[in-house]
Every structure is written in structure tokens, then in C-alpha cells.
Amino acid sequence: ISACLEIRRKVFIDEQNVPKELEIDDYDRSNSECEHFLITDNGTNVGTFRLIYDKPKIAHMQRLCVLPEMRGKGFGYAAMSFLKEECKTRGNSKITLGAQCHAIPFYESCGFVCVSDVFLDAGIEHRTMEYVL
């Protein structure tokens, strides 16, 4: 998990100015309902995301990020493809996520749809999105 947290620090805390106390939460301190995934490229850590299983048959994806210098190379799309297959294998019927508004076109291109109005999370505009498996 330390490699995942280091990437999140670089992206969310350093780049996006999210306060550390909001970025690091109870899901990072306990693994009971949360699983962290590291995105790598030939042994180099390039991104991360986590899945939370706190509702039956629904996986909630959070904290997808790719290091700035590695963006635009398909790692986000690869992660979303893996995410869908992993959740399907686990018997989930739906994936939800809170997307930063600037990232909505990316998630829409992966088949997600917006299901909420805009809300603020850590001072950043988000919308809830879903993908039905």
C-alpha cells in the first residue's frame, strides 16, 4: 500500500492540493473492505486505484490516478478494463465512482454514466458515475 499512497501523494496532495488529512482515510488504515491496486509498466509504478466493497454486489472505485509524466499512454484505460473484469469475476453487478468533473469524458469513454448532480469533495467538483456489469 505504501507505493499506492506515494503515487496518490504526488497526484492528489502535491499536484491537486488536496489536504493530506482528506486524502488519507480509514480505508487506507484498514483493509477490511478495501483493496488497493498498483498500476505498473515494466516494473515501474505509474498509477493506482482502490476498490471498496461496502455494499452487496456493488464495487466502489476510488482514487484512480496516473503520474503526470505517464498520462496519455493508456494506463487509465488498461486499469478500467482490468477493473471491469475483476468486478465481474467477483460477482458484482455495478461499479460506482466519484469522478472529478474534468475526468468525466474519460470515464464516459469507458462506458460509465453520470447519475448525480455536481458535488464538492476536497474542494473539487465531482459527479457520481456508474457502470452496470
Q: What are these language model-derived features?
A:
Residues I1-D26, S30-N31, H36, T40-N42:
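Short amphipathic alpha-helix that is part of the acyltransferase structural core
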Residues L38, T44-I52, H60-C65:
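Conserved beta-strand in the GNAT
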Residues Y53-M61, R71, G91, D121-H126:
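A conserved beta-turn-beta hairpin within the catalytic core of GNAT-like acetyltransferases
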Residues Q62, E69-R71, H102-S109:
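Acidic/histidine-enriched, beta-strand-rich ligand/metal-binding domains
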Residues V66, G72-E85:
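Conserved acetyl-CoA-binding loop-helix of GNAT-fold acetyltransferases
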Residues M80, E86-Q100:
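Conserved GNAT acetyl-CoA-binding A-motif
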Residues T96-G98, E108, V113-T128:
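Conserved catalytic-core motifs of GNAT/GCN5-like acyltransferases
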